[in-house]
Amino acid sequence: MTLSIYDDIFKQFPTIDEWSEPNEKIILEPFTYLGIITAKELPSMLIKAFNYWYQVPPPVLDLILKVVGPFHAATLLIDDIQDDSELRGGIPVAHKVYGVAQTINSANYVYFEAYQNISKLTPYLKSPETTDLWSMFNDEILALHRGQGLELYWRDTFTCPTEEEYLRMVHNKTGGMFRVAIKLMKALSPVQSLPDYFPLVNIIGILVQIRDDLLNLSPAFTKHKGYCEDLSEGKFGFPLIHSIKADSSNTLLMDILKLRPKDVPTKRKALKYMNDQTKSLDYTFDVICKLEKTAKDELKKLGGNPELSSIFELIHLSSTPDIEEKYKS
């Protein structure tokens, strides 16, 4: 390299502005590393299922999937950093391989790519002058971050929320991701006078999150995220909240959470207490059953949807997960 390139620096600007495919691949590596197939993630599955009603044309539906699918996958990268997770899908999380800085940049890049794709939906709007897709997107992404922010605050200040506070948090955090997809579909649907599907969407969001909290304590989840990872992360999952509130005079769980335990014996002790003393796993399962019935009743009132029924079958739990083997001494 010589100083000659600076003789007329203005000639260099077009070259500087160029962006190559190899560079694109480099900055997306933390995102692509986990091999998340967005079509198999629940938000994308729900989009396809709700399209049974909305009948959004395939080219438009593909664009919505390109907004929501990658955005959801990118949030998982950030979640793993905020939770200091070790595993996702049974392999080391992206930030343990590429570092926190590269992973944050990659996730943010995907966020803005998704946001950019919203502009491609505008030509398909029935009333572009009165429909603001960006506001729809922003409202729910703000809700998502509000929910996530509260959950992190509770964790970092060792503040155990009530069940009602937890439900409002999940309504924002998990529900926001689901609602943004359905709002986009509603705005772009050619069907007139559709029922209000958002109560069903909101129930699904809460059902899915409480189910995930319960499964986090089960053997089936261990290979994907590690054994009782919520305890290591200090997270107030639904079973934990119930157990702590069931006997506020017993500080065992709060003491264990403050340790952020990595060792199995300490986690077993917490799990045994939740299962045997406060029956919190059975309580959580009962709540899941009640929410599932509410969701199915709402689905029936809306006239039914075979694709959504298939998703309910997929996420159905027939009993409280068998965790006995995990805390046997």
Curated annotation (Swiss-Prot):
Its EC number is 4.2.3.-. SUPFAM superfamilies: Terpenoid synthases (SSF48576). Its cofactor is Mg(2+). It catalyses: (2E)-geranyl diphosphate + H2O = linalool + diphosphate; (2E,6E)-farnesyl diphosphate + H2O = (6E)-nerolidol + diphosphate. Gene3D superfamilies: Farnesyl Diphosphate Synthase. Keywords: Lyase, Magnesium, Metal-binding. One of its GO terms (biological process) is isoprenoid biosynthetic process. InterPro entries: Isoprenoid_synthase_dom_sf, Polyprenyl_synt. Disulfide bonds: none annotated. Mg(2+) 2 binds at residues 79, 83. Mg(2+) 1 binds at residues 79, 83. CDD domains: Trans_IPPS (cd00867). Pfam families: polyprenyl_synt. One of its GO terms (molecular function) is prenyltransferase activity. Binds 2 Mg(2+) ions per subunit. Belongs to the FPP/GGPP synthase family. Terpene synthase that shows monoterpene synthase activity and produces linalool, using geranyl diphosphate (GPP) as substrate. Also shows sesquiterpene synthase activity as it is able to convert farnesyl diphosphate (FPP) into (E)-nerolidol. IDS-like terpene synthases originate from a geranylgeranyl diphosphate synthase (GGDPS) progenitor in fungi, after the split of Melampsora from other genera within the class of pucciniomycetes. They lack coupling activity and act as classical terpene synthases. This is IDS-like terpene synthase 1. It comes from Melampsora lini (Rust fungus).
